[in-house]
Design a protein with these regions (language model features):
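N-terminal loops that bind phosphate or other acidic moieties
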Residues: 2-66, 75-142
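Conserved alpha/beta-hydrolase "nucleophile elbow" surrounding the catalytic nucleophile
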Residues: 70
Length: 142
């Protein structure tokens, strides 16, 4: 049986995708190939529709694809919407903990809607208004 490849795309307005990809690569020692799509950076750049189309054309139809987009309903997310399927998962409102968790998920574990949903729910707990949190700081941590 042929191994299914998992593809990772981080897509955003301007350079957020590049920065998040760079940080994930740094923290994971670049163990996974991650594509970054940075829209609306320069005048005269290739239209994002074309970039997305070419990217998906380079993948096998059996590949699993995880798309991390910056904003729900935004113009970047809209370019990935037509590609959504059982094998193409689009997550909006990205953050580092969510992206890391999904990139580090074993490729032996098939991506299901339930699995992706659970990671999204877990990542919501990583967004914290720290002023409202009471915790003791260990002086050894500083």
């Amino acid at each position: 049986m042929e191994k299914i490849l998992r593809r990772y795309i981080i897509a955003s307005h301007h350079k957020l995708a590049y920065g998040l990809k760079d940080t994930v690569d740094f923290l994971t020692n670049g163990i996974k190939k991650i594509y970054d799509v940075n829209a609306y950076v320069e005048d005269g750049e290739k239209p994002i529709e074309e970039v997305v189309s070419e990217l998906f054309a380079s993948f096998d139809e059996n590949d699993e694809v995880l798309v991390f987009a910056d904003m729900m309903g935004g113009s970047v997310y809209q370019k990935f919407y037509p590609y959504m399927s059982d094998k193409v998962h689009v997550v909006c409102g990205i953050n580092l903990p969510l992206t890391l968790a999904l990139v580090l998920e074993s490729e032996d574990t098939p991506l299901t809607q339930e699995l992706v949903h659970q990671y999204v729910e877990d990542s919501k707990n990583q967004i914290v208004y720290v002023n409202e949190v009471n915790f003791a700081v260990d002086e050894d941590d500083e």
